[in-house]
């Protein structure tokens, strides 16, 4: 009999914790790592061809996003709450998207905002904006006190191919940053 345990990811379930979305509810998540251990029989090949291992991770990520998983660094997770199904993973087919009147108004109001797609390289300017955001919105969250080296690691050492999208106002001041996964179907 062949040991298949290294061929498939292992899934785990978190304990329950207060739901961040619905007061009085609890949440639970199912998760797995995107960086599984290399296959025992293929270790030399993976070390010789690391991009093929990244390809495996990207295929796993793609497959899991199709069934509602989200990514946070090297972990993919989705809600797995016993008594609630309110969290919905939303995928919008871009070819079918039709802009609403309110979205047109918002776009017109913000027509002075520009964006630029960049490689996944962390900068101090991005980090300062992240700190400002955390201090104003997530001061009790898990990212409070993140260091620049931790931010740099999050941005630059991803198991998935990523890009940075920077948003700037008319004075070229950085006002938004999106660390974005590059995916075959997106």
Task: Describe the residue ranges of each PLM region.
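Non-catalytic peripheral regions of nucleotide-handling enzymes
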Residues: 1-5
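Short, compositionally biased low-complexity segments
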Residues: 6-27, 94-110
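Acyl-donor binding region in acyl/amide transferases
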Residues: 9, 14-18, 23-66, 70-72, ...
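A conserved beta-strand-loop-helix scaffold within acyl/acetyltransferase catalytic domains
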Residues: 72-84, 89-186
